[in-house]
Amino acid sequence: NNQEKEAIDTIGLGENRKSLDSLSLEQDSSNIFQDSMSIVSSDTLLHIEQDTIFEEPDQAQLDSFRYLRAYHDVRVYKSDFQALCDSLVYKESDSTFYFYVDPIMWSDTSQFIADTMRLLLKEGTIDRVLLDQNALILNSEDELFFNQMKGRHIIAEFDSSEVRRMYVNGNAESLYYGLDEEDAYIGVNYTTCSNMLVYFGDNQVEGIKFYNAPESVMTPMEQADHEGLKLEGFIWDL
């Protein structure tokens, strides 16, 4: 109908575009429309659910970039990440998703929380995630023990859809579980400092650099209060 066509035209899909990329937006579990959009590569499916989806842009906006806006209880599903938030903006000009109001994002075994969040794509896969204010990243292989990184701002860099490096800027806190050569837990380390740089391999913490007067406490596994060690803002909903 006319409303469906207006929604399609508003985000600049175009009636004659043909690709294997797919975008589906739903309201109250019923399809509004499905059409092609070059947000993702041809071997992936992006699925978005929301209550409200489009807002009429001016011509200058249409001439400069294609974009998507979704409002109220937005849910995003893609092969290498999933997300929840109240509001979302996607700009094709910089291949960036902007998540607003209590966003939560998941990728593999990691969960991302912040006041606002940006996700940058490169060739259809995650390149970077930028978390602004009250940033918290949780990582767990077994959902029993959780590596945690917290700060004012966090930048997470990805390669092949896995976190490789993470910069934590401002009031940095880290809590991670050390492993021996046989991948058995040996203890939990809690550190505070101004900034930190975290390296990952195979979805595990491989190393951390702490900057500006770090203070650390290492607790053996049998003595650790694992529930009490959860950082402020901890929510696990993978």
Give the role of each language-model region:
Residues 1-238:
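Structural signature for solvent-exposed beta-strand/loop edge elements and short helix-capping sites
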